[in-house]
Structure formats: structure tokens, C-alpha cells
Amino acid sequence: MQAVINVAIAPLTTNPALWAQNPQQSRLVDELLLGMPVEITGEAEQHMVPVRTFYGYTGWVAQDALLTGPKAEEWLVQPQMVVIARWADVLTESRVQGACVAAGLPLGARVAVQGDPEDGWQAVTLPDGRTGYLRADALAPLYPQPCEQDQEKLRAAIAQAAKRYLGTPYRWGGKTPAGIDCSGLCRMAYLLCGISIWRDSELKEGYPIHPAHVSDMRVGDLVY
């Protein structure tokens, strides 16, 4: 069953029982961000649901972090954009004085967009149906394939995406400006440019990464 992440940041864990008892004692393995699609792969246990991410990672996420059923299916087919500000608030009005509909959407979160931007603001819809406005410059296209065909431009775009996380503290399993790990940084930098690589720091068959010699390193290459 398809589902959509319905909160700003949803922790992914491998131990649902321990997480249900004490989240602080259960290891975080990944973070799923608002608007990301997942596949539910089994039955809920202690309010946790087993899922597979769109990039093949598996784990357990809180049941109340998911939107399922027809609403999820309807939202997934709407035009979407991705947040590229480190943090962004969805407001009730297209001005800074608007009340906050949803606070703290992280870099990498996804929203559905309604129409074209007006006066620097973009009308958006969240997975749960709430609507509001984001600054248009806080959003970028959600690329289904590499954002640039020219290799040098693509490499530069990947490096620029990585720089958006400058100053972010290290957090095992993290994937946002609140905290990110090494493979999370690599994955998000590539994903923002339309390339989906494996979540962990390793070469994995079926993902667009191949070995390169350190003497041939160029901008945008990964060093594991």
C-alpha cells in the first residue's frame, strides 16, 4: 500500500518495540521528510508501521506520521516541488504576517503546488489537505531525472546542493539541517539534483554510482 509522510520529519528505526517504549534508546537509521512516498510492507506493531522507501531502504515509522488511502493517492499525482531553504514555514497568507499553517519544513520536504507564483509567493497544499503559502524562492523543481544533461553543470549543481547543509551538526541517521550524517548528506545532495543513490556509504548494485580512482576525483564525486 502506498503512503505519504505527513509530518515534517519522520524518524525511521529498525526496532519498533524499543522505539515505542523509549525513542531515545532506539537507534535512528534514517529520516523521512514531508511528502516523501513510502510503501507499507506489513502490519502495524505498537503504533509503528513497516515501510520501504522509494529508494529501497526499509524500517519502521510511527503510524501517525503516515497518510494512506485515497487522500495519499490523490496527493501523489499533484504537481510537486521541493523545499530548498534550510527551513520554511507555510503561512495562511502570501505575506510574512500570515499565521503559521506548518512550521519548520526542512530542506528536502515536498509540497504540492497550486498555479504559478504571485508576487514572490507560491500557493501550496500539504499531504493532509492543509493549504497555505511558501516563499517562491524557498522551492525548486522536484527532478525525476538529473537536473542537468551537461556533466560539468550537473557536478556543479550537486556540489551547490551539498553546500546548503554547511554548518549542520553531525547526527547518525539524520537527513536535515537539524542534523545529518555522511551518507545522508551525499544522498540529499544528489537527490536534490534528480539522482537517487543508496542511503548508506557503499556501492550497491542497481544505483547510479560506480568506482573511480582517487587520482581522477572531480567536483561532485563521492569519497566513501
Model-inferred region functions:
Residues M36, A109, G220-D221:
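Structural motif
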Residues A162, G174-C193:
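Active-site nucleophilic cysteine motif
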Residues S26, L32, L105, D216-M217:
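Short, well-ordered loop/turn sites that connect or cap secondary structure elements
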Residues L28, C100-V101, H210-H213:
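Short, conserved secondary-structure segments in the cores of folded domains
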Residues I195-Y224:
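...with weaker cross-activation on analogous glycine-rich loops/strands in unrelated enzymes
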Residues M1-A10, P23, D30, L34-E39, ...:
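Boundary regions of SH3-family modules and the immediately adjacent low-complexity/disordered segments
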Residues Y170-G174, R199-S201:
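Surface-exposed patches in mature extracellular/periplasmic domains of secreted proteins
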